[in-house]
Amino acid sequence: MNMYIVVCVYTLPPAYIKKWFKLHLNNTKYKLIIVDNNLRRQITDPTVIIGTNTLNEFSAYNEGLQLLKKEFEDEYDIILMLNDTLFTRHNAKFFLKHLLKYKNTVARLSIPAIGGRIDPYNNICYRNPWSNDIGYISSFCIIMNKPARDLYLKLLSDISPTFPFVDSVTELFNWSTHIDRRFKEFVISHLIDTDTATVWYQSKNNIKNIERLNVKGKCVFLEHYVSGNISKHGVLVSIFPTWKQKTQHFIYEQIAKMERKLLSILNFKVGSK
């Protein structure tokens, strides 16, 4: 099975991504497309796309998929898309191990299908406005088939720069009247309610940065909009469908978090000597 991988990078250098996949997917046939959204970085590697970073990973995914559709249309069976938070905030090895177990399932389906971690709606809005699902696929790492790719690109192209809100995302009256009110409140709360457990982890540092909040708000909207519409016209495939797997995932995420914290402490001690 041929697999194409589209990776959006912010903090990690493209060389790290190439090395990681070469090490961990050495028995898998794949082609890697890296979109670098770090606009401060000087890119000399001709195999790396310089991203626009207009919509974080969503603009990078769109740019990578457009290249894929244009130049490699018939050369792949499955697409893996991810951003580098998979490596900086998650347990990449454990996650991809489970994700790729479903690559044959997703590729085989004739309807639009995406696979990944399904997160539940757990505050304010409890169902997806487009599919009525009680969960959604988290966009940091997914696999998709060709029908899903085509629908994914269409969904992104159908969204205008002034939709679903204009000016400030945090003001309810700036939102389109076509969007479910509970979902609007869900997005706003995720961006500004800094004392809650469901707030965006970068909210406190960006609470007065309206431009940053607007971009993040649109990306949150797109995550649920894309997941809901693909589910409406196809299927979502959960890579952790049982409680046992959900528990394993939680444990391995905590292990990775502790490893990163320990490494940070060790690096600080070495650097301070």
Feature locations, PLM:
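ER/Golgi luminal nucleotide-sugar-dependent glycosyltransferases, focusing on the catalytic module
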Residues: 1-273
